[in-house]
Design a protein with these regions (language model features):
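Bacterial N-terminal signal peptides
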Residues: 8-21
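Sec/Tat signal peptide C-region and signal peptidase I cleavage site
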Residues: 22-26
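Positively charged n-region of N-terminal signal peptides that target proteins for export
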Residues: 1-5
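Asp-box/BNR beta-propeller blade signature and adjacent active/binding-site loops
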Residues: 28-395
């Protein structure tokens, strides 16, 4: 199933165990820009569960944490097809203490939303040692009840709840109560309790050199009526409170969502955005003034979504993204230090053996000076979705 642009985007776009190496193909297609594929790994797979939308952080002690969404594999229960909205979708976590060679077999529960399913846990390792994880949710209501809600975003009988954040101060073993961010300025989507939905996003926020957190969120506002756009929120207290800063991207035709943010050595904030109504092209917007404003968005010149940008030891940037067109898989580019060569950077095929377009959503971390791990969700032959990874050698 192809994830609808509004189904994460939530409301914005519908509208749109022990492990081992499992695949060594495509090695001849890597090696570009000093990046070489070593092997693919299965990080977590259970045929009873649909596992998807991971993120990864490397703790100061070297431990790796992978968070992901897990829901029942509904096809095993006799239901038709799969869905990205499920009342039993929870946020889970697995660990590795040996640089990804083995992973904990029994996943730990991060959070179960009391009002519905939880989505896309997006972790960031903060400099104070804590981990901040953003997510969002959907509530399942009876169809007649959902239909009565004013200005709600619906996906069938599901109603969008908006976003929230979770914090752990002990390496992901325990998580504090949810932090509810404010609605985006001008938000027109209301939740089931009659209030504008809290800010939300699927993608990486970043901690700037100034210590502040920068978070690009998706929103359906009155800025461009009916069109999802993106906006910047900033936190000066490690994510406890957030202030609206400025619009990031809006357009009368193109919708934007699922944004990952990256700060370059010169302090430029680069927003890598998923699009709809734009032939699946990546869009990019830049802020040259520490998030006070963004220049007009631009076409990056290639297809793929969503994205994660990882700084390499030499300060170049590894940009990874899902590829939901035949051949389905995971791709990457190595950008210069200021991310200025988007269109000209050679595309690196990490995987092209996916069973359908329902895959991707990669995240990455460095393991050492010359090794990186990219994690994502994957399927073979349209089988049960699982969390996989690709180990890279970096020259």
């Amino acid at each position: 199933m192809r994830r609808n642009s509004f189904a994460f985007v939530l409301p914005i776009l519908l509208m749109t165990g022990l492990v081992g190496p499992v695949h060594r193909g495509l090695a001849a297609q890597t090696g570009s820009a000093g990046v070489r594929k070593v092997e693919d790994l299965i990080i977590y797979k259970d045929d009873k569960f649909y596992s998807s939308f991971p993120s990864i952080v490397r703790r100061p002690n070297g431990e790796l944490l992978v968070a992901f969404r897990r829901a029942p594999e509904r096809r095993l229960l006799g239901e038709h097809g799969i869905t990205h909205t499920d009342p039993n979708s929870y946020l889970m976590l697995v660990r590795s203490r040996d640089d990804g060679k083995t992973w904990s077999q029994a996943p730990e529960l991060i959070y179960a939303n009391p009002f519905g399913g939880s989505q896309d846990p997006c972790m960031v390792q903060l400099r104070d040692g804590s981990i901040l994880c953003s997510s969002y949710g959907w509530a399942l209501l009876q169809t007649n009840a959902a239909a009565k809600l004013k200005d709600a975003f619906r996906h069938g009988s599901f109603v969008f709840l908006g976003g929230y954040l979770l914090r752990s101060k002990d390496g992901g073993h325990t998580w504090q109560a949810p932090i509810i961010p404010p609605p985006t300025s001008g938000e027109t989507v209301f939740g089931p309790f009659g209030q504008p939905v809290p800010a939300y996003n699927r993608g990486a926020m970043c901690q700037g050199k100034d210590g502040r957190l920068y978070w690009v969120v998706a929103s359906k506002t009155s800025t461009v009526p009916g069109k999802p756009g993106t906006h910047l929120l900033i936190s000066s207290d490690q994510g406890d409170t957030w202030s609206y800063s400025c619009p990031v991207a809006a357009d009368e035709k193109v919708a934007f969502s699922e944004t990952s943010l990256y700060e370059t050595p010169k302090g430029t904030l680069v927003a890598f955005m998923r699009t709809a109504n734009f032939d699946d092209h990546t869009a990019v917007a830049r802020s040259m003034d520490h998030g006070k404003s963004f220049q007009r968005w631009e076409d990056a010149g290639f297809q793929g979504h969503p994205h994660y940008a990882l700084q390499l030891p030499d300060r170049r940037v590894l940009l990874v993204y899902g590829y939901r067109h035949p051949p389905f898989g995971i791709r990457a580019r190595v950008l210069d230090v200021e991310c200025a060569n988007l269109a000209s950077a050679p595309e690196i095929v990490l995987r092209d053996d996916g069973g359908s377009g329902d895959l991707g959503y990669p995240w990455a971390t460095m393991l050492s000076k010359h090794r990186a791990l990219v994690v994502y969700y994957f399927n073979s032959g349209d089988g049960t979705r699982h969390i996989a990874g690709t180990l890279l050698s970096i020259d």
